[in-house]
């Protein structure tokens, strides 16, 4: 799937930014190598992502794919810095994936 960019507006940015995570950090995580899984939200198909920023901060994100003018864009729904338990899970998943790739 080719993603053309991000879908930011006055609806999603305030919700993402209220926990102190910047747009740049959110984009770094989603463009990096996050662990991505389905989100159980009942109303619309959403995804969860956990990953690290270039500065090494761990971020938890909820996002969805939006088609705008025939282009697929990532629309962040919410973002926050991860708790230690989530960081431990993320690092464990990275190790499992690294071993599987060998």
Per-segment meaning from a language model:
Residues 1-102:
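Ribonuclease/tRNase effector modules and their secretory precursors
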């Amino acid at each position: 799937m080719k993603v053309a960019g991000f879908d930011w507006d006055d609806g999603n940015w305030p919700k993402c930014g209220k926990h102190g995570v910047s747009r740049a950090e959110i984009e770094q995580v989603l463009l990096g190598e996050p662990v991505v899984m389905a989100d159980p939200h009942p109303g619309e198909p959403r995804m969860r992502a956990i990953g690290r920023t270039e500065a090494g901060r761990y971020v938890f994100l909820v996002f969805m794919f939006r088609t705008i003018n025939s282009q697929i864009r990532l629309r962040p729904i919410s973002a926050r810095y991860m708790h230690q338990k989530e960081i431990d899970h993320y690092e464990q998943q990275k190790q499992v994936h690294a071993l599987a790739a060998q």
